[in-house]
């Protein structure tokens, strides 16, 4: 990922997910997130709901909700991720499943 901008209560990141890749199933205690699909197609899990999002579509992930992003296509996926909250820390993460074994 690449941090594009930081403020006192927000961070904006660019995230690239390669073909077949996915983020861990995770939640955050201190922040909400908003994802914008900039390029490609994303399979998004929020709690027990699964949606497919295409370019220019967005989704909001409330604080405390389990969520995951996956790229099941043959091309790369690029999202712009907004973090909102009073505590914005990379360690504010609880992982439930992770293909990279970071649990």
Region locations from a protein language model:
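Short acidic-glycine-tyrosine-enriched beta hairpin
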Residues: 47-66
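Short glycine/proline-enriched turns and hinge-like loops at secondary-structure junctions
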Residues: 28-29, 54, 71-74
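Double-stranded beta-helix
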Residues: 68-103
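Glycine- and acidic-residue-biased ligand/ion/polar-headgroup-sensing regions
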Residues: 30-48
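A generic "binding-loop/recognition-motif" signal
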Residues: 21, 30-31, 49, 65-66, ...
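A structural signal for the main folded, soluble domain(s) of proteins
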Residues: 4-7, 41, 68
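A short glycine-rich, His/Asp/Glu-containing loop-to-beta-strand
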Residues: 1-32
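Metal-cofactor-dependent catalytic cores
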Residues: 2-8, 47, 95-102
């Amino acid at each position: 990922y690449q941090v594009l901008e930081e403020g006192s209560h927000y961070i904006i990141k660019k995230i690239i997910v390669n073909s077949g890749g996915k983020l861990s199933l995770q939640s955050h205690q201190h922040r909400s997130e908003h994802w914008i699909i900039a390029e490609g197609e994303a399979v998004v899990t929020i709690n027990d709901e699964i949606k497919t999002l295409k370019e220019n579509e967005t989704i909001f992930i409330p604080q405390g909700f389990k969520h995951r992003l996956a790229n099941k296509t043959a091309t790369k996926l690029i999202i712009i991720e907004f973090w909102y909250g009073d505590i914005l820390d990379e360690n504010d993460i609880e992982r439930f499943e992770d293909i990279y074994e970071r649990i």
